[in-house]
Amino acid sequence: MTQIINKDEVQETSSKKLTIKTANSIDQAQFELRKITERTSGTVQDEAIKVVDDILKNVRERGDEALTEYTSRFDGFLTEKFQVSSDLILKAWEETPRELQDSLLLAKKRIEKFHSLQVPKNITYTGPNGETLGRRWSPVEKAGIYVPGGRAAYPSTVLMNAIPAYVAGVNQIIMVSPANSQGEINQTVLAAAHITGINKIFRLGGAQAICALASGTESIPKVDVITGPGNIYVTLAKKKVYGKVGIDSLAGPSEILIIADQSAKLEHVASDMLAQSEHDPLASAILITTNTKLAEKLPAEINRQLINHPRLKICQESISNWGLIVLCDDLETCAQLSDTFAPEHLELLVEDPKKLSESINNAGAIFMGPWSPEAIGDYLGGPNHTLPTSGTARFAGALGVETFMKNTSLIDFSKEAFNENKNAVVQLANSEGLHSHAESIRIRDSKSF
C-alpha cells in the first residue's frame, strides 16, 4: 500500500487519520517514486533556463558591471566591491559563541580525518619488457565553493566543500555566497570559512556567481572546479558551464528514504522525515516499511511534531506534496524499491541494518540504526553530506577529495618493450585506417638511436 500525505490532511488535528491510498502492485509504488524523482522537471525549469542563459551571456561580456547589476536586483544591495575583508572574517570567528566554535572545530576535525583517508595513491607498474606505467594524482589549482544563502545559513556546506579541497592540496579555494540586503554574509558561515583554509570570499550568489567563477571577471578569479549546492538557477548554471570547468554534481531538492521494520520507533521516523522536509518545500521524505502500525500512526505523529514548528509552512508543503509511505510485505521488497529510487539519504531503522545494507546498491549515504540519524551525517559524521539526488545515486557518489583532483597517465617504454609490441600497434592502427599512427611506429623501427 502507498500513502501520500495530502496538504489539507496535514493541517488537520492529529486525532484524525489521513486517508491511505492503496497501491495494487509494486509497479504503482515505483510510479509514485518516479513522480518524486521528476518533480523539478517541466515549465519552471524551461523558464529558468532562459533566465540563466541571459545571465551567463551578460557576465561573460560585461564582467563586474553585470555582477553589480544582478547583485542589486536579486540581493538588494549595491556594491562594486564583492570581496569580504580578512578582518571581517576574523571578527566573525571571534564573535562566534565558544560552544559553537567548539562544535565547528569538532566537525572540522572529524570531516578532515575521514577525508584524509580518501587521498588517492599514485601507482607505478613495471611491465614484462621493462616498460614503466603509472598513474599520478594532482590537485586542481583553483576551486570555487558555492555556499547558498536564502532560507537558512549553512556553515556545514562550507566545511563539507572546503575541507576536501584543502585536503586535496588545492592552492586557492574561493568561496562565493549571497549576502543579505545589507551586504552581509551570515556570521557563522564566515566563521566556518575562517577555519577551513579558504583564501578568498566574495559576496555573490545565483547563476551570476557560477558564471563569474567559470569565466573570471575583473575581481573574481577563474577556477578549475566548482562545487556546492544551490537553487534551480545555480544548478542550471553549473550544468551550462560544465566542460569549461569541472563540477561536483547537479544537485536537486534533498530527499530521505527510511526503511523501517517492527523495531523502529514512531517518533524517530517522524522526526527524521521532518528534518528532511524543513530544508525546502521541494524536499522529499519517504517511508518504506513492513510495519503496518507504523504506517498507520505516522501521519498523526508528524502532525503532532509539527505543532509550533518554526518552519511549519515549509514542512507542510514538503510533506503534503512529496511525502510518501509505502507498506511492503518484507524487507527484501523494501530494499528493491529503495534501489529503484536511489535515494540521496537512506536510513535503515531495522533490527539488523548492517545485513540489510549489503543488499543496497543505490544510495548516496546509508545511515544504519537508531543512533545514526541523517543529522549526524549532515554535520559531523565524517563522510561528505554533498550527495547525489534525483536518482543519480545509480551512477554517482558523494563529493570527496578526488572531486578536487585529476589523474595523469605515465607511459615510459624501453626499446625492448617497443620492439616487443610494435607489430601489434601497426596492425591496430591499420585496422582503424590511421596511416600516420602506423607510420610513427615504422619510422622508429627503421631508425637506430
Curated annotation (Swiss-Prot):
InterPro entries: Ald_DH/histidinol_DH (IPR016161), Histidinol_DH_CS (IPR001692), Histidinol_DH_monofunct (IPR022695), Hstdl_DH (IPR012131). One of its GO terms (cellular component) is cytosol. The keyword NAD applies. Its cofactor is Zn(2+). GO terms for biological process: L-histidine biosynthetic process. Transmembrane segments: none annotated. Keywords: Amino-acid biosynthesis, Histidine biosynthesis, Metal-binding, NAD, Oxidoreductase, Zinc. This is Histidinol dehydrogenase. The gene is hisD.
